[in-house]
């Protein structure tokens, strides 16, 4: 009997023990990260060929304590490697673990390699070559404190590499993990299995191979024991031939009852190819389809729905995921009454959107992600009862979620009517009206943007996350917007250039209407959309004041105020901003509104430096500086409270005798230094109340606005 060790992912050790025991292993003992067991030659090969959960199967050679790299070298160089393989083979060393003496795994691997090749030289043999790509022999070393175990890796390549997956989707499951999910799902061999978001098909393929009695390594060509001198070829051939015969016999008995659905036809083609390589293509029916229209393919039977849907670190955006999980739960309760359901995800809060109570749950790792697998039993109820429940479901999230939905609905009724009368299709529907829901909801034509303000540090992260899920679910329901047209952003206090930080690179622009102006917006690539909605009335006022005047737009952002000034009949416009991105955006806004000519200048510059050097005058100036900035492209930091008087001194110099400055900023509690302005010869009148539109009247501190003129 040989002493062996099978490694596996953490959390799967007990499952692996059961599997190995069923394959004939003796004295199986669970430890963290694997299972020790004993096996004769046939059982050894059987576990290699048939284990669906083991990552590697190791044959320990050296177990000792080491206290230095010299001890490591001595232990390795003193072993009888010629009894294991000859000098003509290639080898590679996998080294795992460190201690105070062996601080780097590469150093540990090098010392093991040195010990092996030096042993062969001392025996008068040639030095065996190292091959990192496809070695004939793989040596596995594990160091835990002073405890060293060196083993022969009988697997060769890791056992999760079944050989059937030529291609995969964007976020494939490792095959060993997929097998564990199937085994934990409660699925019974012989019953239907449905994966509504199957991706490259790994879950279904693993299950189909289980039912078809196809050994997971049946098609493997290279093994870690191929050049092992103790390899028992006759025992291996017996075990492999038994597996081939069993697979051929079983395949004739099975009827297809595996079903894979996915929205992406391209990934379905990959799944079909993978199933063909795995020998189970005739057992699985593939169909392109949206989970929102999911139908039960086996109405008269009871089976299992198994799924690894997208989650935060995988694919999609959060609003789409919330909607996806919500509609998935609805379809399950409508179409799969009495069925078992097993869902694997890294987002426990997303699983809450299913609105189902789990009967069992298991923790697991998917790479670096902490994940959970939850099993559910769908109750047996009539479909009309389920439909009625789904209609009211969003109201059940919590009492506050109902309040949020009601408030949003009330605001929509009031604001949408007003916006239509004003000729607006970009406006705010909700702005942290309820303290429990600290977010803003904006409409941009057919799109909804939900901006989540950062939660205070004393608010539990999971609680805040759940409230956000509830709010997005309610927003989808109340507005009726399509899930791909709801954009979610997390807004935090901006520091320096963070306000201009790029979030994505989709490049998706469309225009909205504002008092006769058309303005480009981008809802995904930046934290801001290109249009400050709270300044809408300010821009309208600028348009009304601009006729026949030379207009300056300083800190211009995307130039929306310039558009209004030009449409209002400005004699000339000068638009200044430090960002090339936003200046190009401003240019496109001008083009969109047929505003062209040399009298409309766009200048990329540090606004403060440009202003100091400016030698012309303007009749109307709009300046909307940031609250704070420390951009590397600016010589000094900027603080609107600290520096606004200096700014006004420079603006006064370029302001014509009868000119007007419209000055605005977003600093809460901003105090205009009226005494200092008077000393400069300027008078300032606050007009904030006149520039707050209806959709922002609930937040009177969102900005402050001033009209400034020569005394």
UniProtKB/Swiss-Prot annotation:
Residues 43-154 form the THUMP domain. Belongs to the methyltransferase superfamily. RlmKL family. SUPFAM superfamilies: S-adenosyl-L-methionine-dependent methyltransferases. It holds the Pfam family UPF0020. This is Ribosomal RNA large subunit methyltransferase K/L. It comes from Haemophilus influenzae (strain 86-028NP). The keyword S-adenosyl-L-methionine applies. InterPro entries: 23SrRNA_methyltr_KL, DNA_methylase_N6_adenine_CS, RlmKL-like_Mtase, RlmKL-like_Mtase_CS, RlmL_1st, SAM-dep_methyl-trfase, SAM-dependent_MTases_sf, THUMP_dom. Signal peptide: none annotated. Keywords: Cytoplasm, Methyltransferase, RNA-binding, rRNA processing, S-adenosyl-L-methionine, Transferase.
């Amino acid at each position: 009997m040989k002493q062996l060790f099978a490694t596996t992912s953490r959390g799967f050790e007990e499952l692996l023990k059961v599997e190995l025991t069923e394959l004939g292993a003796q004295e199986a003992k669970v430890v963290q990260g694997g299972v020790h067991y004993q096996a004769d030659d046939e059982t050894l090969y059987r576990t290699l060929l048939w284990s669906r959960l083991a990552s590697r199967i190791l044959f320990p050679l050296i177990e000792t304590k080491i206290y230095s790299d010299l001890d490591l070298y001595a232990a390795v160089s003193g072993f009888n490697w010629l009894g294991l393989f000859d000098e003509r083979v290639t080898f590679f060393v996998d080294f795992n673990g460190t201690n105070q003496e062996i601080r780097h795994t590469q150093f540990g691997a090098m010392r093991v390699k040195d010990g092996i090749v030096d042993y062969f030289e001392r025996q008068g043999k040639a030095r065996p070559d190292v091959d990192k790509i496809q070695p004939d022999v793989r040596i596995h070393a594990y160091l835990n404190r002073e405890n060293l175990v060196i083993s022969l890796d009988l697997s060769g390549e890791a056992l999760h590499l079944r050989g059937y997956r030529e291609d995969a989707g964007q976020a494939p499951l490792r095959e060993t993990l997929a097998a564990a999910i199937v085994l934990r799902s409660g699925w019974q061999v012989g019953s239907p299995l449905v994966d509504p978001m199957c991706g490259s098909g790994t879950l279904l393929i693993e299950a189909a191979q289980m039912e078809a009695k196809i050994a997971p390594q049946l098609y493997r060509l290279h093994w870690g024991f191929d050049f092992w001198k103790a390899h028992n070829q006759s025992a291996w051939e017996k075990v492999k031939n038994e597996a081939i015969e069993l697979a051929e016999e079983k395949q004739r008995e099975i009827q297809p009852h595996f079903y894979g659905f996915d929205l992406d036809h391209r990934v379905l083609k990959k799944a079909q190819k993978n199933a063909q390589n795995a020998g189970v293509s005739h057992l699985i029916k593939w169909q392109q389809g949206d989970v929102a229209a999911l139908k039960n393919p086996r109405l008269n039977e009871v089976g299992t729905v198994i799924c690894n849907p997208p989650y935060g670190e995988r694919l999609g955006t959060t609003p789409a995921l919330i909607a996806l999980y919500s509609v998935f739960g609805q379809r399950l309760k409508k179409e799969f009454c009495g069925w078992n359901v097993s869902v694997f995800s890294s987002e426990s809060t997303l699983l809450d959107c299913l609105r189902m109570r789990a009967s069992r749950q298991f923790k697991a790792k998917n790479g670096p992600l902490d994940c959970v697998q939850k099993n559910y039993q769908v109750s047996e109820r009539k479909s009309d009862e389920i439909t009625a429940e789904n209609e009211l479901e969003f109201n059940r999230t919590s009492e506050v979620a109902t309040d949020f939905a009601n408030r949003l609905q009330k605001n929509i009724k009031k604001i949408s009517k007003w916006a239509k009368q004003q000729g607006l299709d970009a406006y705010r529907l909700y702005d942290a009206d309820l303290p429990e829901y600290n977010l803003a909801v904006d409409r941009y034509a057919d799109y909804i943007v939900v901006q989540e303000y950062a939660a205070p540090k004393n608010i539990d992260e999971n609680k805040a996350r759940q409230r956000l899920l509830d709010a997005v679910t309610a927003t989808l329901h109340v507005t009726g917007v399509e899930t791909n047209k709801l954009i979610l952003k997390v807004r935090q206090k901006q520091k320096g250039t963070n306000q201009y930080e790029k979030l994505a690179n989709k490049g998706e622009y469309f225009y909205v209407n504002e008092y006769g102006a058309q303005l480009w917006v981008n809802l995904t690539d930046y934290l801001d959309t290109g249009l400050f909605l709270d300044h809408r009335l300010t821009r309208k006022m600028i348009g009304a004041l601009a006729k026949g005047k030379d207009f300056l737009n300083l800190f211009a952002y995307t130039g929306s105020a310039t558009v209004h000034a030009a449409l209002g009949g400005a004699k000339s416009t000068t638009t200044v901003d430090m960002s090339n991105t936003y200046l190009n955006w401003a240019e496109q806004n001008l083009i969109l509104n047929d505003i062209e000519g040399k009298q409309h200048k766009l200048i990329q510059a540090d606004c403060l430096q440009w202003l100091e050097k400016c030698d012309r005058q303007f009749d109307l100036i709009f300046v909307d500086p940031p609250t704070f900035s420390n951009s590397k492209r600016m010589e000094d930091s900027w603080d609107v409270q600290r520096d606004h008087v200096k700014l006004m001194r420079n603006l006064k110099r370029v302001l014509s005798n009868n000119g007007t400055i419209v000055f605005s900023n977003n600093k809460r509690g901003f105090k205009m230094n009226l005494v200092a302005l008077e000393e400069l010869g300027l008078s300032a009148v606050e007009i904030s109340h006149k520039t707050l539109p209806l959709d922002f009247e609930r937040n009177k501190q969102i900005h402050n606005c001033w009209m400034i003129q020569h005394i």
